């Protein structure tokens, strides 16, 4: 089977030749796998082109993103995994470059503020620009028709008919609280100034929905909607808030995906159990990553495996960063034993192959998946 055939067989709840394997690689590992130097990385949130104390042009920033996307494809080929992803973090307005506020701090076109951390080759979110209704009144959101989708076109071209291209997108579940300056502020708004929270959420959701539609129109094979809406203690909001503000965008995106014949994977870290029935009822096709510290992948497979495919959940909090080879291999087997029977399963890490993961553990992860994840499964 090709990688694409393997993926589609699995997500349609049939058994392929092998369990499909996904790995969300930090650029650190892309460099190690390809032996090539990537453009200066901005972590998960942009493809490259920025570094401390240096100004880059829009063209240089864009070309850095495209080159890093090419290297990601070469890396998955060398690693032997099955899914090729492209993120909406690398879709931005034409002639855009993040605005540097100082040598280490920048703001993106959505008003999310990040701090560069060159010592660990990544960045992290710190704030947002919308502090009041007056700020929202003045804010000009990006135009979905004026965005640069070159990176999606490149991914689809490179993948051809061999690899499935998964478009990573965001809707209304996460960007509003990042732009607002924090989940705590956004939650206060929901109760003390709900009109403000609703306006902000609608502004973001409407734009991101149109961006996602444009990504679909460029030929991706699946959508992975990546809004984190829960923590280890449970969902961020009560179910009525989800139903009013967040779920309508998911439901509409599911309809659009199905109209185009592609699948919709819902990603969120944290404990989703309190809202999982409601999420599945929206018509989503898959759930990821089923965080192992707070959710049981075998239980999720048993309860929901006839309706959704399962993607997860080798532990990237402890085992992949700190575990031994046998720890990694054992955790891969745990996931396959729990969820792979009958298809409907894609093996992945429980969030990402972040910079603190040990490189050799990524190799053990894939090797064990290929050895143990051969259908018919061994018991």
At which residue positions do the language-model features occur?
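Active-site loop segments of alpha/beta catalytic cores
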Residues: 1-65, 107-108, 113-122, 130-379
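Acidic, polar-rich N-terminal leader regions of halophilic archaeal proteins
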Residues: 13-14, 78-79, 90
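Catalytic domains of carbohydrate-active enzymes, especially glycoside hydrolases
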Residues: 68-87, 218
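Generic structural marker for isolated residues within well-ordered, non-membrane alpha-helices
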Residues: 72, 103, 297
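Short linear loop/turn motifs
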Residues: 73-74, 90-93, 335
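Short acidic, Pro/Gly- and aromatic-enriched capping/linker segments at domain boundaries
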Residues: 88-105
């Amino acid at each position: 089977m090709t990688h694409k055939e393997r993926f589609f067989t699995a997500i349609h709840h049939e058994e392929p030749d092998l369990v499909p394997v996904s790995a969300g690689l930090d650029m650190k590992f892309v460099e190690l796998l390809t032996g090539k130097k990537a453009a200066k990385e901005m972590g998960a949130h942009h493809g490259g082109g920025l570094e401390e104390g240096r100004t880059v042009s829009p063209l240089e920033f864009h070309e850095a993103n495209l080159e890093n996307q090419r290297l990601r494809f070469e890396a998955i080929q060398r690693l032997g995994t099955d899914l090729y992803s492209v993120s909406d973090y690398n879709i931005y307005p034409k002639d855009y470059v993040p605005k540097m506020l100082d040598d280490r701090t920048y703001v993106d076109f959505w008003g999310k503020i990040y701090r560069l951390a060159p010592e660990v080759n990544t960045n992290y979110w710190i704030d947002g620009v919308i502090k009041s209704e007056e700020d929202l009144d003045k804010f000009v959101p990006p135009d979905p028709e004026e965005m640069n989708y070159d990176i999606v076109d490149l991914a689809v071209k490179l993948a051809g008919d061999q690899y499935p291209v998964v478009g990573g997108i965001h809707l209304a579940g996460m960007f509003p609280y990042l732009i607002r300056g924090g989940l705590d502020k956004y939650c206060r708004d929901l109760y003390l100034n709900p009109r403000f929270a609703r306006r902000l959420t609608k502004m973001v959701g409407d734009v991101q929905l149109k961006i996602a539609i444009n990504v679909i129109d460029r030929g991706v094979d699946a959508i992975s909607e990546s809004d984190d809406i829960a923590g280890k203690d449970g969902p961020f909001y009560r179910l009525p808030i989800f139903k009013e503000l967040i779920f309508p965008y998911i439901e509409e995106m599911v309809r659009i995906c199905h109209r185009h014949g592609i699948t919709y994977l819902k990603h969120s870290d944290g404990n989703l159990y309190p809202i999982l029935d409601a999420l599945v009822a929206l018509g989503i096709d898959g759930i990821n990553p089923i965080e192992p510290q707070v959710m049981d992948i075998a239980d999720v497979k048993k309860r929901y495996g006839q309706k959704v495919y399962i993607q997860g959940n080798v532990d990237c909090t402890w085992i992949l960063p700190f575990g031994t080879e046998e720890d990694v291999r054992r955790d891969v087997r745990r996931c396959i034993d729990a969820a792979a029977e009958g298809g409907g399963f894609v093996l992945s890490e429980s969030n990402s192959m972040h910079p603190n993961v040990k490189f050799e553990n990524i190799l053990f992860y894939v090797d064990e998946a290929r050895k143990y994840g051969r259908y018919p499964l061994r018991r």
